[in-house]
Structure formats: C-alpha cells, structure tokens
Amino acid sequence: VTEASTEPVGTFCLVLHTHLPWLAHHGAWPVGEEWLHQAWATSYLPVLDVLDRLALEGRRNLLTLGMTPVLAAQLDDPWFVDEFRTWLGFWQVRAESLASHRDPSMRALGSREFVASQRALAAMAGAWSGGLSPVLRPLVDSGAIELLGGPAAHPFQPLLDRPWQRFALRAGLDDTTLRVGRRPEGIWAPECGYLPGLEEDYAALGVRRFLVDGPTLQGAGGTTADAVTVGDSDVVAFARDLEVTYRVWSPRKGYPGGRWYRDFHTFDHASGFRPARVTSTATPSHEKAAYDPQRAAEAVRVDAADFVDVVRRRLVDLAAERQGRPGLVVAAYDTELFGHWWHEGPQWLEAVLRALPEAGVRVTTLAGAVEAGHVAGPRHLGAGSWGSGKDWRVWDGEAVADLVDDNERLRDRVLKVLAIPTPDRDPVRDQLARSTLLALSSDWAFMVTKDSAAGYARDRHDRHHREARLLADLVERGDTTAAGSLAARLRAVDGPFGHLDARLLPGSA
C-alpha cells in the first residue's frame, strides 16, 4: 500500500494592501475622517483580530500585509486614536437608539451594532490603546505575517522623477522601521505601478521583492505561477493570479454580491446603519429583505469552501502543466474589502486561512514563497499597474492631465528650492517636502478618474499644491519669519513622518 503524499499541491500567498490617504484634519463627512473611522472599525480591528487569534494558536506565515506609512501614521496618532474612541462612542449611542424601535428586525440590528461597538471600544481600551504599532509588531515579530512597506504617501511611482521616487520610498521604509523595529524587505508598489528600472532603486534601498499585476508579468512572457527576478537585478516580482483573485472580487462580480450578505449601499438613514441583505443586485434598496446573520454565516462557509476548491484546483492544474512541479498562486486585495465593503469578509478570511492547509495547500508569505523556490527569471517587465486597462491611464489620463502637469511643476520647483544645501535640519524645508509628498498621493488622480468623491480629491490636490508653492515662495525670498509661521501651521494639520529630512532629497539623484 502506498501512503498518500503529504507534500502540498502548491503554494498560496494572500496579500492584503492596507491604505487610505492622509485624511486627518481634512473634513469629516462623507469623505474625510469618517472614511478612516469606518475602515478602522469595520476592517482594521476585525482583520487584525483574526490574525492575532490565529497567531495565538501558533500559526505562522498566514499572509503578507501591506501597511502604507501614511495610514500607519494616522492609526498611531494619539489625536486620531482619541477621535476614533469618540466616534465609537457615538456608534454605541446610535445602536442604543434602536432599542425601542417598533420593527423587531431593527431592534435586532441595534443589538448587533451595540455588541460590535462594545467590542471595538474594548479593543481601543486594550491592545489598541497605543494605536496600531503595538498590535502590529507582535504579529511581525512572531512570524505570523510578513509586513510590506512602501513609499511614504503612496505616490504613483512611475510618474515620479528619480530623486522624488527614492526620497519617498526611503522615507516610507524609515517610517515603517520606526514603527515595527525592522526594515521591510518587501514593498507594496502603489497601484502595482511599474516602470522599467524601478527595480534598480528598489535594490539600492534594500527592497528585495514587490508586486505587479498579472498582465505586467504575462506581457513579459512570464507566468503568475512563479515569481521572477527583474531585469539585471536580484529583486523579485510577484504577480497577482487574476483567475483566482477575481473569484472573490472583480469590477463585475464576486462573493460580496451574494444574496445573503449585508448590502453595503442600503442605509437606515435615521441610525446610519445597514439593515438589509443584498437580496439581488436588481432589487431596489427599499425592497431589499432584512439582514439575517445566520444565513450570512452559512454563505460564508459555502464561499470559503468554494474558494479553497478554486485554489486547490488551480494548483493541481498548474502542477500538471509543469510536469509535476508545484506552482504558486498569489491573490491580492485591498484590506478594506474585508469588513468595510464586505461585512462578512473577516469571517470568510478566517475560514479560508484555516481550511487551505487542511486541503493540502501550503499557505505562506511572499518571503516564504521565495524560500520554497517559487522564483524564475530573469524577466524584463514592461510598464503596468493594477488599474483599468492595466496601464497608467487612471493616473495620467485625460481626466487628470491638469493634475499630472501640476505635479510635475511642483516637483521641479521644490527640488530646486531644496537643492541649496543646509548643514542642519530645517523644519521649514522638512514641511515643504512633507506637503509635496502629500500633494503627490496617487489617491487624488484615482478618485478624479473614477469620479469617486472627485470634488474632494481635487480640493485636496489644490490645497496641498497651493500650500507647498506658498512655502516655497517664502523660502526662496528668505522670509524666515513668515516661512516658519506657515510651516508650523501646516505641520499642525499635515504632520506625518516626523523623521522626514529634506536634506536627503537632493542627494537622492
């Protein structure tokens, strides 16, 4: 009798990209701080709770977590931590207001929301009392997750000049190092944006791996079943397997659209809560059925089992195509999908992470995939992104041509102003660099192109540009008093990356 093989059928890597732009002090509703509060309460708390629970069971190499420096700065900010606690308190009050509602389903909704708010408040009084980093660091130290860093304020790197590209990435890596005590070896390249030659700057800054979208690698003759070394470097690129990734969520379909899941778009406007299930995509909001958490939990079990089956079948097929050599599947998503957009997402995530190893699939991180030998190459990749068309059109298309021009002029202007050497750090120059980085965030162009809170995005773009130009004018004129006063006011509102040293920018060339 031959014993069944205990070798895994292949390797699966789940990558979660955790990002929101700098929102602190820039409006509340409907876009602004409210956006971050909701994502914090419904995604970041429950997703990290899932990871912590699995880590306490001794599980390691669960997934790869990208955490952008600009988001981490907000989740660690004592002011924002206090603001979030206040927001959670109002959440609880809103839940209590449903206790006497005449509709039993609304009373049940209030009870669920009250319990959820209690759980969140307890987390903020406990492990999260000091912000994100005290929660994140043990997961990194224990090997439960691999943490990806990235450029400071999430710029679309292919559109940056080399000095700014290196400066933003160095600042971001430094920031993550300060927060978790170790320098990331991998990064999430914002928007999976790639330009040939970026790997050279990655290598120079100690980055050993990054992600691109599947078509970027496939266009170079590669396959998503292997990571590759890029160009003449030793830097490794991983690519999303879109066949598997899109099973969960794509621009047109995915599990969150299932009829039993909570509907994201239907609100009880008096309380602000979501009382309905999807029912069907064609059902008007006022006709959607009440949410049933038990039926939703059953849907989670069904969809988790389906995903495990999809991953396993994909890996079995890859092994057959590769004469028995195990393949790699990388699925990558925004963390905010799990909990915020898809209420049941954290439950599904936990179920999948438990079930995949039982199905004979090796679950690991990007670093673990390298150690397991899933690296081919080299490949010379072409330009790409994970946006519409898999090119750069979202960030350099006609709808945002004026933003692109503004960014180019600002980069050139500030680079010239900061090129004059200074022996000591200057808080005015540091703030000029900081304001410029915030102006260059990829989010503003994305929101305009997608017409998603486009007015807010244009306002943010214009404001950061206006403030940076004014500060540059004062520096050039030598008006140290006015420049110092303006820089201090800006720092009070836009003050992430306190370690930022503008003297490093000219030297990045």
Model-derived features: positions:
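Active-site and substrate-binding clefts of carbohydrate-active enzymes
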Residues: 2-62, 67-112, 116-119, 222-509
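Acidic (Asp/Glu)-rich catalytic clusters
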Residues: 6-8, 52-60, 131-148, 177-180, ...
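Short, solvent-exposed turn/loop segments enriched in Gly/Ser/Thr/Pro and often Arg
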Residues: 66-71, 151-153, 186-195, 366-371
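Glycine-rich phosphate-binding "P-loop"
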Residues: 149-171
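CE4/NodB-like, metal-dependent polysaccharide N-deacetylase domain
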Residues: 165-189, 310-323, 327-332
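Conserved short loop/turn motifs at secondary-structure junctions
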Residues: 183-194, 334-338, 453
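Hydrophobic, small-residue-rich alpha-helical packing segments that form membrane-like cores
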Residues: 193, 198-207
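His/Asp/Glu-enriched short active-site or ligand-binding loop at hydrolase and phosphoryl-transfer sites
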Residues: 208-219, 362-365
